[in-house]
Amino acid sequence: MVSRSYSNLLDLASGNFHSFSREKKRFPRVATVTGVLSELDDDNNSNSVCSDAPSSVTQDRIIIVGNQLPIKSHRNSAGKLSFSWDNDSLLLQLKDGMREDMEVVYIGCLKEQIDTVEQDDVSQRLLENFKCVPAYIPPELFTKYYHGFCKQHLWPLFHYMLPLTPDLGGRFDRSLWQAYLSVNKIFADKVMEVISPDDDFVWVHDYHLMVLPTFLRKRFNRVKLGFFLHSPFPSSEIYRTLPVRNELLRALLNADLIGFHTFDYARHFLSCCSRMLGLSYQSKRGTIGLEYYGRTVSIKILPVGIHISQLQSILNLPETQTKVAELRDQFLDQKVLLGVDDMDIFKGISLKLLAMEQLLTQHPEKRGRVVLVQIANPARGRGKDVQEVQSETEATVKRINEMFGRPGYQPVVLIDTPLQFFERIAYYVIAECCLVTAVRDGMNLIPYEYIICRQGNPKLNETIGLDPSAAKKSMLVVSEFIGCSPSLSGAIRVNPWNIDAVTEAMDYALIVSEAEKQMRHEKHHKYVSTHDVAYWARSFIQDLERACGDHVRKRCWGIGFGLGFRVVALDPSFKKLSIEHIVSAYKRTKNRAILLDYDGTMVQPGSIRTTPTRETIEILNNLSSDPKNIVYLVSGKDRRTLTEWFSSCDDLGLGAEHGYFIRPNDGTDWETSSLVSGFEWKQIAEPVMRLYTETTDGSTIETKETALVWNYQFADPDFGSCQAKELMEHLESVLTNDPVSVKTGQQLVEVKPQGVNKGLVAERLLTTMQEKGKLLDFILCVGDDRSDEDMFEVIMSAKDGPALSPVAEIFACTVGQKPSKAKYYLDDTAEIIRMLDGLAATNTTISDQTDSTATVPTKDLF
């Protein structure tokens, strides 16, 4: 089964033309096509499809991709399979946040292994009845992928556990990584079988499928793709230990929107992108964006919620009320503390038990009156660590019960057998306090469920003997290290490693006044009830639509091989400068202006040697000696340095310190801009910069005649960036009344006079030539960073003005493929030099062909 656009492409290639009239979207009956993704691994095809075939879709559709389908399967005694929705699945619950007219398709694995002979039939049934597309993973491959790479490498690492010994996650296994890639490719196959790439949205969930965005982006450059990580994202110091760290980061950056539960998780991801990929981010109007090859990858911070109506419906069940009554009688005259956790090493069950033990030791009066009910769900992974946690938990429970128990009283009730959902709900209802002491967790929705259940309903109030009009109450003790903690402002937050603090929190939760319990509950209930799973899904989809809004107007193409693949997305008018084209224009024009940046344009960024090479000097001399040319080199460097470096270029004009100083091309003295009256502000700014230099290792101050620059190129990227933001705010504050601008650049903060920029040189050149009655018919302007954008803006805005010939050729060229006001680009400084050399060679050829007796035009001076 393939997408309609893909089928159309095959038909066109074979000459089988059909009518492409719009029709209602429909699914093929059976997903049976395999091997669709084979071209993704062919590096010869790395320049993937730039634009996808027009779709015949009329209805919005979103494809939800997760490790598991929200489907339950059951095989009866006759061996026949039946399927039903898994109402507990988050992927199913998020449908409540979708628009009514949005169709939802699911792709994922089934929990049960399906025989090969049954797969076609199962696929057809799931597609027709549930709009689900199953991904079938061979058992051995699934074991390596899920229990291997996901659970032995990613899961521990994302929860801050390093494989320091073979028992702690194990050493990195390349075969498990290959299995992870293979499974992600299978998922990509399934997506491509059903997607209409121009219209459909794709939402990928969790760490199991982190490389899927690359495979999808490689096939469809404009795919509308969101990714949400449901686990923590570790700090860069932890994440950087992963051998495939860059591959995973680059894969995620092929999404349009990346979602995290908390700011901490997003901050760690951004830090990793900065430290390992050299990417910077910007926050604008509350949205965080990473610029990545012309694409803006949006970062979304959005904690997930719960499905409230489902909980309320279960609260209304008769069996729930019966179970609540049973538990009320079981724990009569006792206060119940409740813990609900998976049986794994990160949930902190043993820490909770130790705190309970200490509570009963320090407060003998609570013996017989307080019970901890610990519900331990089966672990999702398997291994030695799970067995150790289970053994430790059972041993600790046994010790506490033997020490403090008595007939009719069991201090800790451990429930390690699966409970039905209504049974768990009943425990929420009767619990005085809910305890979550995980040492690291993604979101953890247990506190949210507890809050809604404590709100109750009239029937439950009657069952447990509460006045229906009485205010509801609840208490939460939560770990600082779980995703829901920042959202629960009324909870008692604890460091679970501090047993004393957890014990004190448990005691306080038991003795706090009824009024405070009610106040905390009301605050939590208001938040949880308004930030449910529907709100979460709706907000994510809205942001995804915004993030993909400019896809159609961008020109996209793929570069890079394998997992290094990425898409360059640029304005349609932005294209690579053809050297043949510019040389041709150069030859047929007579009044030419050439404006050149230096650092990053004439010399490679980060080079140890920054002085011009002999080749560069020769090229500049050849160009500037042509009487038809006016050539200016415009730099941020000071005039003394430029004078020294280009002393042999007699006909070269210079612009120093971003155009504040200009030396005309006749070799006369430097001229100074009249925009600035004084530099008294330096006495204020320099001490501030010096303070930040002393406290930021690796930073330096560059003092110019007209500007001060604080550079943190060699400082820690995160700390340097943080210090730069603070320094900028500090400088803006102390220099409010001074005529200066404080700007950030590439790892620098610069203070300079207002109105001084490289555009001044371009403006003066155009004005002077117009006054002389010589209209320019050729302009070349080349630069590589933000400071050069002012030159680009001036010459592009002069296109139809009086300073240029009506047939003027304008070439604004930046270095590298990136967003710019320039209309052309060349890949690097080597291509810039090659282009300039081509123009210089044209001068030599023309000179050789000119009659020696011909009159040489007088060179214009500026």
Curated annotation (Swiss-Prot):
InterPro entries for the chain: Glyco_trans_20 (IPR001830), HAD-like_sf (IPR036412), HAD-SF_hydro_IIB (IPR006379), HAD_sf (IPR023214), Trehalose_PPase (IPR003337)
PTM-bearing positions, type Phosphoserine: S5
Glycosyltransferase is among the record's keywords: yes
Tissues expressing this chain: Low expression in leaves, stems, flower buds, flowers and siliques.
A Pfam family of this chain: Trehalose_PPase
EC number(s) recorded for this UniProt protein: 2.4.1.15
GO biological process terms held by the UniProt record: trehalose biosynthetic process
Recorded GO MF terms: glycosyltransferase activity
Source species, domain of life: Eukaryota
EC class of the enzyme, as a word: transferase
Induction (UniProt): 90-fold induction by sucrose after 24 hours and by heat stress.
Reactions performed catalytically: D-glucose 6-phosphate + UDP-alpha-D-glucose = alpha,alpha-trehalose 6-phosphate + UDP + H(+)
Chain spans, region Glycosyltransferase: 60-546
Presence of the UniProt keyword Glycosyltransferase in the record: yes
Keyword tags: Glycosyltransferase, Phosphoprotein, Transferase
Effect of S5A: Abolishes binding to GRF/14-3-3
Modified residue annotations for Phosphothreonine: T32
Post-translational modification: Both Ser-5 and Thr-32 must be phosphorylated for binding to GRF/14-3-3.
Family: In the N-terminal section; belongs to the glycosyltransferase 20 family.
Xref: PANTHER family: ALPHA,ALPHA-TREHALOSE-PHOSPHATE SYNTHASE [UDP-FORMING] 5, TREHALOSE-6-PHOSPHATE SYNTHASE
Subunit relationships: Binds to the phosphopeptide-binding site of GRF/14-3-3 and to MBF1c.
Misc. comment: 2-deoxyglucose, but not phenformin, enhances the phosphorylation of TPS5.
UniProt-recorded name of the protein: Alpha,alpha-trehalose-phosphate synthase [UDP-forming] 5
Organism: Arabidopsis thaliana
